[in-house]
């Protein structure tokens, strides 16, 4: 910028006077002593410039020339005529190159608006310094803005110097007068700068062969502000006297200059101090900081604090609010009402609280008294709110927020209740998401059920959609929902008459479920029944395709009669019209062109296609197939009929007529026994005259019999029968002689008639009485989980319910000729179990040993239905490794009904454990096992069997039993030898835990299939190959209270020792009652087959103590962990007992710890454990990695124990039964044997939960207990069943007598054979 030199004060007064005198005239521009716009002076010379003007004036000099320079001198004086003008002379001695620039003379003020000045540009010519400013080493920064003018100030010291502009490294910028303009007074001028000029520029010139250059670096300015933020939150809470520090941080682009300022309440009083700094270490942006600090805040400092940032046209601000409190406090209020509601399935739900506190308190949320965040990983505490992720039904409860300032002893808490509403769920939909359409027999009574759960309890509505036929080409006959629907009520006659709609509610698995039962009185119309369950959060719908059929099974071939050659063959193929279409016949190759198939007859419920073949011959025998297409699946379905044409045969006498002598008034009968094809026509003759049927003469069916009532003398004569058909005729004769008189009294006839009438009435009454006695009673717990709360047993019989379960003959039917029945394995009330060899099980070409359940001879129809019901239930349950699985059945006519299940050759677990009492070892002894394995060549070691079982994966659990090792006949013969070898092996703690774990897995599966066992005990656990145990007798549909075959069939009793209290007193059976029984089963296992409650009299006192919480002591071989599991299973409150899934996990952990302590993994169970649970096997490399949370298969075994070397003391709050001391004549009840059947249902009716204080004896006669503990507890060893060896007993043959009953210890010591040694009862509890 040019500098101004003010004039001296000597002439100041005169100047103002003169200015006043000339104010009225126009001033002239000051005049310089040099002419032109530029003037050249050689370097080192003196520059003289004189300015003459009409006013006092001043000089403006180049920026590099200082006014204080000693080389500069300005002289001011009056000049002109009479001194009326002002002159000043500027003298600059020893001029230099940087003195080059603009020199101007101007008036300091002007009476007119327009300024007046005279300018001359002076060049100081210096050949050694051609540029006024030299920047050779460090370039000068030039700020540029794209699109605006930019000056590159490479000014020269002489007007005629040629300058070249270059952009380093190689580009030369040539002035073109437009984009680049050269000005020797200013340098290079660029009117509109672009990105082209960004970079390092150089001005170059050459003088006297020497090259000179000066460099400039262009700098593009921006106004980009990336981010602005404060170090404090939007709301800052402080206590009086606290310090406040707010840091305002700005991120801006490179080449951006920012200006940061603060506005705050104490700004006027300068309450705060501000410090600023810049951080250019960031490669992406410059970071600017402005920090406002107030040492001790007061009330005046509360308010809004704002940080303002400006860069060119860009303006931004960020603010925060500061609140100053006088003291610390907590205020807590609800934002909403006390009862909050959420919907299950919601992704997130917030429990809000209105909190005002200082300072911020510690926040704790409790759910039902326990820390919420620890209780569930889905709970998150954010600020003062609790956020529940993926809301579930179990999230309902009481939530308490606790705010505390422990340092100052301040706290507040508030509780709200969360209700989780659940959309209606229909459990039948869960069982079958896409149910196949059901066929219902015409005029039959049908029951439809809908089991619903929801919160609040849903309203259930039944709708009816009549069928309409969709006449499209591809789905003709398909029954689809119509637009019109009808609301159904009891007594509705729309479509089908509704007999009743009943709703029942029950608590199942802790949920209050409602079941609605729709009873269709008579199936007449096809359509869709829709069960709609709705509440305020949603609705669910279940559609049941109700297709009425007059054809058995919906697709059937009927044959009018067995054809004879020469007759017509008529076959009718009928199919339900809503299920099938495109019916056609497939004929044997031998059938010729005389075949005639009529056009399909479309009836109300079905389509019938009749096939007629006239004048058939033997060649027409064969298989006739009717083909139809299933409308729903699109698959072709075939129905076959084997037709055998019978050849014609001439009549032949099977027996000749015999001469008879008949008394008068008696009756005579002649029978013409002939055979022929076709059936011969029989004609009777007397004395060669044809006999016609008339009063007193009766011709039997087909005229085969001739019956003469009250024979007379004239009936005597020669009787002849002639049998004739197309092939010929045959005859036979006999003479009937009549003797005696006709003098008889009519009293004989009257007496005979009355006797017949009386006998008929007596027989009718006897028949009705017997049928009433055999009428089945039905329980309140049915075969299906859904039926358990649905049907009134008196209203819908069990067999009718189970008729709804399907039986797929193509999958399960096995020809009887493929079975070779063997020895008997057991028997029940009306059935028996036999061993059999089966060929072709699951299409295998080899033989397999199986167990076959069948009825005894003389079984009734109801018993047949019961076994058929069991078959259907077993199919419904499915397959699992640890249950006795169904393999097939024989149901077709022509033989007995047989249910084929897996054969477990080692018998039941109870007998097996008893046989191993003398061979129990806590750990495995490899040397002992090796010795036993050497005794028989070719026997696979136990470890080898486990390795073989490792190939069994859980993927087969629903398709097979887990064992695909079908045996040949030679293998079957070695079963007993293999069983004997198993009895030689010692029993270990690992085996006991393994049995417990497997039973828990099997029960977990059964409970998942909604199956309740109700008689879970060691006698109902069978031992199979590879130490695999299987649960049996779980699929029997029978009510133990109402069925007379079970309750009072001889001395059969209820399994009281294994029953839960709620089952004993209230007859409640569910999964949790099975858990109780499982705890008793654990006691049996770890007592090595002992009878539960040893030495305890099973009477009312026992039941009362059981209700009060008295439990069994720990068995001898149980560890603390095992006994704790038993106590958990025996909790009085069923809801507090663990689920079977929890028991599987706990026992799986114990089993894994047990086997790993021996340095190996349990291969069979580990395989199953890995496939189903997702845990890695212990041999998996993943186990070698460091997991933050240990896997059950990778955990340490340091805490594992095998044997209870000391007496386990139960918790003090658990009372245990004390064993009764043995007295000389102590007699125990006979019903404490291992069969476990005690107390008939009539006696159970006397018990209630409140109990009776009066003690009375349940049994009048007492017998000897066959259990170790009850009969021999005082004289036997703790581990051995016998105090003597079997050899010693055989020599001494000692017998111990109690009362009148003798217990042979020889039998007690003898190991049972590898067979089913217990009775298999069919009359078991239902699921």
Curated annotation (Swiss-Prot):
- Glycan-bearing residues: 48, 73, 82, 98, 125, 247, 319, 383, 398, 409, 413, 470, 512, 543, 593, 615, 663
EC category = transferase
Signal peptide segment = 1-24
Post-translation changes: Autophosphorylated on tyrosine residues upon ligand binding.
**Domain Protein kinase positions:** 819-1151
GO BP term, example: vascular endothelial growth factor receptor signaling pathway
Q: Which UniProt keywords apply?
A: Angiogenesis, ATP-binding, Cell membrane, Chemotaxis, Developmental protein, Differentiation, Disulfide bond, Endosome, Glycoprotein, Immunoglobulin domain, Kinase, Membrane, Nucleotide-binding, Phosphoprotein, Receptor, Repeat, Secreted, Signal, Transferase, Transmembrane, Transmembrane helix, Tyrosine-protein kinase
GO cellular component labels: endosome; extracellular region; plasma membrane; receptor complex
What job does this protein perform? Tyrosine-protein kinase that acts as a cell-surface receptor for VEGFA, VEGFB and PGF, and plays an essential role in the regulation of angiogenesis, cell survival, cell migration, macrophage function, and chemotaxis. Acts as a positive regulator of postnatal retinal hyaloid vessel regression. Has very high affinity for VEGFA and relatively low protein kinase activity; may function as a negative regulator of VEGFA signaling by limiting the amount of free VEGFA and preventing its binding to KDR. Ligand binding leads to the activation of several signaling cascades.
State the name under which the record lists this protein. Answer: Vascular endothelial growth factor receptor 1
Query: Source species, please?
Result: Gallus gallus
Q: What is the lineage of its organism?
A: Eukaryota, Metazoa, Chordata, Craniata, Vertebrata
